């Protein structure tokens, strides 16, 4: 297991994380956020909502899983000002369930928020896409990457996302978004999140994240 700050005590890191202080630092790599229990399902709503609502840990910030369990339900690590360097990237994998009635639209996007929680940049976006008819409750898989390609006030990040969902127990459909480059001021601090939005509110339109990870490289 990769451990951040090898010269720091694990006990101190656990305490820092439990107090919400799991901020990234220059040189940090590995899995920095892991949801391991299902959260609240996004259902009967058209409100854009985070896909990370379940119980979580920051596994790479502590020495072992037993100690990591002390720091449950941590926020996704903050990205401090200046952290993003050329080639620095984020990757994420989300596995969950989805069900719908009819063919509603679904949008999933990866965003950066400022300290006030306001979305300031969209790194990757599936856009609102009409789903194929879904039979029963099937799997939902979201994969994304976002890589810094320029730094400074006029910095840039290239992002891509793919959303795979089952139309039946044995057939899948993939929503792919072409990788795009967007302007990002890397001198500012941010938080990263993955958001989903249903186009139609229905109790039958529901999705939930069972497990999910965010990594830094």
Language-model region placement:
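Short, surface-exposed terminal/edge motifs of secreted or surface/virion proteins that either
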Residues: 2-26
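Surface-exposed molecular-recognition determinants
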Residues: 3, 7, 27-217
């Amino acid at each position: 297991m990769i451990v951040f700050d090898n010269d720091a005590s694990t006990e101190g890191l656990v305490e820092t994380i439990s107090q919400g202080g799991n901020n990234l630092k220059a040189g940090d790599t590995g899995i920095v956020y892991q949801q391991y229990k299902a959260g609240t399902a996004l259902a009967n709503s058209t409100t854009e909502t985070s896909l990370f609502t379940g119980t979580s840990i920051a596994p790479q910030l502590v020495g072992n899983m037993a100690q990591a369990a002390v720091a449950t339900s941590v926020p996704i690590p903050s990205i401090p000002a200046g952290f993003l360097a050329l080639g620095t990237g984020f990757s994420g994998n989300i596995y969950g369930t989805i069900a719908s009635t009819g063919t509603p639209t679904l949008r999933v996007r990866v965003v950066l928020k400022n300290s006030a929680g306001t979305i300031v940049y969209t790194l990757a976006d599936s856009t609102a896409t009409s789903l194929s008819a879904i039979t029963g409750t099937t799997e939902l898989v979201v994969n994304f990457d976002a890589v810094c390609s320029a730094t400074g006030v006029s910095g840039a990040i290239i992002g891509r996302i793919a959303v795979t969902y089952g139309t039946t127990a044995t057939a899948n459909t993939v929503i792919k978004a072409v990788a795009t480059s967007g302007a990002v001021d890397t001198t500012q601090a941010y938080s990263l999140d993955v958001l989903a939005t249903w186009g139609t509110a229905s109790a039958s339109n529901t999705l939930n994240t069972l497990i999910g990870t965010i990594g830094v490289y």
